[in-house]
Design a protein with these regions (language model features):
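N-terminal helix-rich module
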Residues: 1-4, 9-33, 37-41, 49, ...
């Protein structure tokens, strides 16, 4: 019984030091990465374009199975929305991985579809553009920024954390 009481006291002191926001932002980065990986895989499997649009206003990702490859939502085409974690949104970081940043979604040839920045995955798995997608928490602390990077030629995704003023590649 005494051991349980000691564990409870130690836990009470440790609880305020746990950074739950960091876990939410990490989960949101994984959500973005998984959505992009699934879109790429779907494009290769189904052999048509999959259009991924970033709804920066509503903090969600729209995934369109574009059967006729026209980059617009038509009748009969399947659309899925993937919301970001609670209190996480797309945002411009203090500095980008490769220098200055113009917006939360950056890339060489990012398209705009229905007023949203958009990547298109083609049937060979390649993306329409390289891209850096930046997210953060509502409090926007500098250590809360995350980035998911898409490599255009292969559609491969990587994710990064902004910690202590530098970008560090994260795993899983």
């Amino acid at each position: 019984m005494i051991v349980i009481a000691i564990i409870g006291i130690v836990a009470a002191f440790a609880y305020p030091k746990v950074n739950f926001t960091q876990f939410r932002v990490d989960a949101a980065a994984r959500t973005v990465r998984v959505a992009l990986q699934n879109a790429e895989r779907l494009a290769v499997t189904r052999q048509y374009d999959v259009v991924v649009s970033f709804d920066t206003v509503n903090s969600r990702i729209r995934i369109l199975e574009d059967n006729n490859n026209n980059a617009t939502v038509d009748a009969g085409e399947h659309v899925i929305y993937a919301p970001l974690e609670d209190s996480v949104h797309f945002s411009v970081p203090p500095t980008g991985i490769s220098g200055s940043v113009g917006g939360p979604i950056n890339g060489g040839t990012i398209k705009t579809v229905d007023g949203m920045p958009t990547l298109i995955f083609h049937r060979d798995g390649a993306a329409s553009s390289d891209a850096d997608i930046y997210i953060t928490s509502k409090r926007a602390s500098s250590d809360d920024y995350r980035c998911v990077r898409v490599i255009q030629s292969t559609g491969r995704t990587l994710w990064w954390r902004y910690l202590n003023g530098t970008w560090e590649q994260a795993s899983l």
